[in-house]
Amino acid sequence: MENINQLIKKVKSLPNCRVQEPTKLPIVDKNKHMLPGDLKEFYSLCGGLTLFENEEYPIHIVTPEEFILANPVIVGELCEEDISSNWYIICNDGKGEYLTINLSEERLGRCYDSFFDRHGIVGESQIIATSFTDLLEKLIKNNGQYWYWLKSEFESLGDAYDDQE
């Protein structure tokens, strides 16, 4: 796996991709959530980025200001009793669909497909990457084509709710 700095350099060299200047780290509730090291490094080096904006499936890694709890945006409320209350928006497709990242200590860094029809639904909340670095690497390799986790050759990483009672 490449490191964050290498991945950002790669994005800067790709056509139809933009890297924003760094501004600040995202603000999270430090009593409940923590930023993974690779995410801290990402936001210290850049302020978000856009991958393959002229392709069929562009994706935006959000700015620190847009890095917010997902449930109030996607569901309309926090849903504190659900594990999805620990998920933050990490990407959007510019059309109202999101990818999220878990900031709870137990599942730190796991990334999920949080499109409107499957976000926070048991059995439908697919783990699409094990860390932010893993997600960024896979999105770059995907070249703006059909979502990699929906392709038949994608090896399942399980569901967000698999280890829930």
Give each language-model segment a name.
Residues 63-66, 102, 128-132:
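Helix N-cap / beta->alpha transition motif
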Residues 1-98, 151-154, 158-165:
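A surface-exposed partner-binding patch
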Residues 91-93, 104, 131:
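Structured loops at beta-to-helix junctions and adjacent beta-edge loops in soluble globular domains
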Residues 97-105:
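Broad, structure-driven detector of short, well-ordered beta-strand segments within folded domains
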Residues 114-141:
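Compact, glycine/acidic-enriched structural inserts
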Residues 110-111:
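A short, structured beta-strand/loop element
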